Amino acid sequence: MTKRAGLPLGRAFLVLILLSAADSLFFSSFPRSALQLFSSVLFTDAAEPDSDATPGLRPQPSPRTFRPTGYQRIEVKTVDEELPEDLKVYTASTRGSSSRTFEVRNAGGRQEGFTLSVLTAGGPLPHGSWSWSGTPPEVQTTGGSQISFGWVPDTETPSLPERNLLQLKRMLRDEGLIEAVQLRAAEKGCPVAVLHNLRQLPVNFREVLHEEYESRSNPAKMYEVANSYVQQRGSDAARWSVSQSVELSLLEMHATSTTDPRGSSAVPSFLETGPQVRVAMTDAVPSGIRVYATPPAPRPVPVQSNQTEKERSPTSKRLVGMQLGLYLICKLAALFGHPTLFLNPYYTEQQLLEAVAQALGIAPPHRGDFENEGNEAQATANQHNGSADQLLAAIEIFRLGPNPYTIGHVLTLMIAYLDYESFFGASPSKPFHSWVSLAASAGNNTGFAMLDEMCDNHRGPKRRGQKHWYQTGGARKHKNRDMLPLHRQLCDALELVLNGVQQIQIDLMDELGKYKTGVEPLVDPATNSARIHTRTCRGLSPVCDYEATILAPVRALEPHEQQDSLRTKKAFNLVTGYGSGHVGQITGSIAEPFSHSWRTRWGKVVADPTAYGEIFERTLWFDDRELMAKSSGALFRQYDRIAKDSMSFGVFMNVENGLLKKDMRSKLEAYISQRKSFVEKRQQSRFAKLRKKIPENDPYALRAAIFLALNSRTFCAQPTSFLSSFRTFLTNQYHKLSQGRNLPRSQRSLMAFMRTGQVKFFQEWCSFDPLAVNALFLFRFAVSGTDPAALHDRQHTRVSRNKKTMRILNSKWTPAVLKKLMRKVNHKHMAREAKALLLRSLDPTVLSSIVTAFDFITHTQANLEVNQNAFMYHEVRAREVSRQSAAEKGSHRLHERGLVRETDDMIKRWAEHGIPGDIKRRLARGEKLPEGMSFGGIPIPNLTNWDAQLNSKWLEAYNAYLRHPYGRAALNARDPVALLVKDSRDRLQAEAEGTIFLGRIAKRVHQSKNLLRRAGRALKTFFLSLLRENERSEYAVWFGVKVDMRQVIQTCRQINSVAEVVKNDRLYDFITDGWMELVKDVVAGYTKASVRVPGFDTISAANEQLRKEGVAAATARNQGFLSIHYDYANLPEEERKKEFQRSMCMEQCEALWKLVMAFVMPNLQNPKKLKGYEKDFSGAKEIEKLNSPHHVNAFRFSLSVQIDFFDNMLDKTSKKNLKAMKFGASTWFTYAMKLAGQVNSEMGNPNLGTALYMQAAYYGNYIRKWMEQRRKSRKQAIIGVLTLGMMGLYALLNVADIVQHMEDIGGAPPVSCVTNEILGVTCAPQAIAKATTSAARVATQDFLKVGLFAGMAPYLMLPMAVVSVWNILKSEIKVLLQFEMALKHTFTRLKRWLAAPFKNWWAKRGRLKDALFRRASQTYRKTEQETKQPPRPRNLHNPSSWGDTELDSLGVPPEPFVQDFEIKYTTPVFPMSAPLIKA
């Protein structure tokens, strides 16, 4: 009797059980009975593991056998007792599947031990048990060692051997990886072979590998197959192979694209069953099981010549690339997609690891078990080390695909095999870490420390100021000198891969940090994964997939939104997949849902060999060596030197036509044998001790193998050698880029090749081969010497170091004049070069974001009506009956002084809210506050939604205009301006939350070409700039806009990626200018200005020379002019919306991009600065302070805000506009700070963004005072310069006067005179003694002495000089002025304190003088009255007759009472805040 059950693939745990009388007899014939339960696999006549079966033979289809398609799971329990007749098997499923109990009847139990093997599909088995009485015992799963939420229970710590073995077990028996590999292979149509012993694994993998090599070696055949599938063709076949499965997948893809109206494919799919499809199944197959169709037979390919590059169509290239990608999937499935092997507890981890190494070729073939290893086996292993087979097998690791997670997984396993005794021997000496643990820990540099432990690296102590792994990696040392060269090189390769993975870790954290998921780089992966699930899963589910999170889109996305959503999905899958690498000791059903989800997700990441290629490209992002050149770059010159070197033994000669696999092997064997002979001769030489010792183990053998592999035809479907073809391709690309001019070396490096868009041409040339980047990686690895990882770290350090000029330009201490000089030199030429670089480097789709990144909400003309022209609608003469109430009367009124003046006043009121006038006066004078007064007691305004309050003012103004009789009449007449006001009102009501209002000063247009007037304007501009004054404009041109921040930042990231290529060149400073040139061109072409501006010439507007000549109509207008379609009122609704956007973009897009780039680019170029601010605001206490009265009032009163956003981040045009605004500067800067907050929140600094938004109103009020102080400081600086100049002139004149005086009195030096008949008498000074100094030194000393004495002695000019120098410095170095403003009251009190002694002395002197005169007068009169005659002069030395006196012993009258105050500093408030005065 037979029972069978079927459940959907991937969800059922137990699907089918076949038991019958015949089966019972069949099982009883085995010495160890095995009951096997398959999900979709029927029993075959399979032997036990490692039984004597013929290797390589696959089971033939039989009436009771068909291919397994799902995930399989094995649980084994050995019972050393008699199996009873009522044996029961209990299975429990996960959420969503059923639990079943199956009864097994086995007549006549046996007395010996039995093994019960349970194979399940679709997921882990939380509990599986069997018993014959009572509660069935629990059986742990292999996933039971996972923990959730990063908590490790207080239990005994496992030993080093146990930890190492557990890590290896998790890599080899990764259920999620095996399941994902199987499912992906099934989706792509790869053949599935059920292997029954480990000896079949290398044979199976080598068969797939051989088919791939055969296909790659014949690119003409691949293109013939690809071209045939461009049209609809296909046929049936009776044979099954990897190459045919590739063709089948292409056929399926074509069939799904050519479906009939009913949705059925025109070509039978391999997942269908029908008369055209042969199915390897019988009637015993359960219904609903997914089965495979036999693929079509390959068509005979006629012999033809290889196609040239021009003859290959892009469609055919992409199909060839798909074919090659399918081979990679099938290879990975042949290597790891065998649950019957990797999940079988019969095999140890040692056996599984050696089987994988044998399949790749790292281990010698057909080697015995580890535990039975003898001297002969050890000798075989030693002989295999460094052999041609092992070296070519090492290259095969990098041919598994461009997925760095796949490569890293295999590299880690091979490192474990090569150093097995150190990791898993009887006495292991170092820890072993799984690949997922290394990748998950790379974000905080811990992964490199773990890798150093595995590979015996020593990076040394971290130097002061160094915080990155690559800054110490360039000088790291190898501790183990006995390590095999191949082992060392695989470690270096793994470190390079880990470098690429680490570079995206911060991006992943920033991407998920935008949604406030709570991820942190220093937190363990399991905790980060649990945080993400807890905060993003819908329905409060503890674990979910990306599609079930709030991050998944719920509507159709735009193209740029799709890229952003894909980036978020990758970040979610990677960070949550890292959780599977956190090993702990929590077991049971609580941790199982989390660990299973994380294992499954990580398995999908590793199982796709063609995914995440952009991460693997990052391993090449920092190589600044020359790649493209006229003939050969630095990398190819290094290759040529190696090829011509005598130690290469000529194996690289005559390889231009491409090598076959057998040729590679023969050349590599010849190289190994010749080097071995050379070393032996060298050692036997009599001069061996005098010469440099050559190691017996060749450190350059892998390099030779890589060069031979790259000279084959197995890369990029090239008919000749890859390296020779690639050299030709680079030469052609160089000529296309240079176009006859000298292209800088930095733009021809490998780094530039990968970052500036050249790689996309390389991919197309390479027929979209998935291994294209792998070939570049191997080439760079081979020409990087004996330590490629150290070289990579040194290059990374050199490239990442900020230029000195950039540090100077962004420094607070740099004078403004120096910044201008550094920027102005050759500015226009550098901007054009930057534009050319961006134009050839950026994806053309990026340019569309120039106009789509901004959604204009309100129109300039609408704002002109309610702001500049508001006075026209202030008083309305109408009948009183038309106004029923005061509210209606007020609704017709607009702000008489303009709207922005009202918003400025509102911001000022917020900044001074709750502060009495007496307190403000006391603070301004630095006096003490009243008793009991504190900052915490002053009320603060409610600015939670300050932008909504400001936006409501604009709405009120629009409504007032539309209610005004003129506005109503204009709207009824469909006046374009009235329609713009109405459209702006409607859009602002719908998008009020994200709208930002900004203003620009309309440029004055000077049409006169009179030379005198132009000279007068230039002279006026010079004096205004000298005084830091501007031609003030009462009103600006205002508009409302909503910024698509994600699209803007995505564009800026791509721009910055291009900019980093030229980071060490001066061009780096002009990338923003180059982008602005591109913006001008795109806006001019998109907006069609000629439609709305009569006489507008697009060509002359885009041409700088024509703009100078005044040909363009744009020079005769400014942003305040009406620029709208002449028939705007009659346009359809959709066209009117488009015209609204185009007319605004024509005027404002350029200015908006300047402002946005000023905020975003410094964040990308110098992220440490804003990360420091983010850290300051990230604490819970700092967040609470944002609404704390004490903190807010200290912030308002101290005026100690940072002005980086104004000085170092605002663009030049915005600064000029802001300084020229007579009204509206506070409003503009307040909204600009809101924009800066949005930028920082989107870029992963949410706390800083929140702080900027909450304090924006105070910033706006402060910036007005800041600009006033800057104007005053310039005037003080001018006075200081004049003072110092006069002092210097005075000293110079005194020196000249002294010299002239000496000459007049005969003190001149002696001279020697000579009489000449032609010239007459000539006299020269005569030396009377040996000179002890130079004349210049004497003159300088005299000048300084005279100046110093003149300043100190007679006039006390030294303090004047110090004050003058201070005024000049604070005028040019803005941080000094900021410091003075912040400590203004402290300086006032300090000045009073310093002046008090002099003031008191002068007061005492005055009082003494008055007392002396008064006493003398009284004495004189008294004496005169007594003697009746004028008194005689008294003796000044005998004061006894002076009478009574009120003077003290020193002759000084007593002092009046003076009230003293004590200066105390209160609790620290905002940085650099002024102290308070308390009595």
Curated annotation (Swiss-Prot):
Swiss-Prot/TrEMBL keywords: Cytoplasm, Disulfide bond, Host cell membrane, Host membrane, Membrane, Secreted, Signal, Tachyzoite, Transmembrane, Transmembrane helix
Record note on what altering C1313A does: Impairs interaction with AMA1 and inhibits host cell invasion
Topology of this chain in the membrane: Single-pass type I membrane protein
SS bond partners: C1313-C1323
Effect caused by changing C1323A: Impairs interaction with AMA1 and inhibits host cell invasion
Signal peptide: 1-24
Subcellular location: Secreted; Cytoplasm; Host cell membrane
Protein name per Swiss-Prot or TrEMBL: Rhoptry neck protein 2
